[in-house]
Amino acid sequence: MGFNKEDRILINNNNSRISRGISERYKGKEGRIRSNMMGKRHDVKSLLEYLDSTCIPIENMLCNDDESSIKPQSKYHRQKKFRNNFSSQNKFHHQKIFPRQKFSKFHR
């Protein structure tokens, strides 16, 4: 009887094979992540440009200060606009489902 530190599960004779499979799968996943990150130089300078840039207040970003140009929208108009976002173009087009092909037992 023992305790696997990686997976935090109790190991005895009954579930040692299960825990071994889990720990091997965990190690494989960790190895894939490390190998994907190895040898790649990440561009840190481009990320630092965003951090070093000065913030502009929202008030300075507005083009037109004239409040009369902003029209209040009615409740009906907002509902109609919301409904139009879900037009038939955005619906998923499901593929045609064909019947399963019957293969012989030698073609598996």
Curated annotation (Swiss-Prot):
Can you name the source organism? Acanthamoeba polyphaga mimivirus
- Stated name of the protein: Putative DNA-directed RNA polymerase subunit 1 inactive homolog
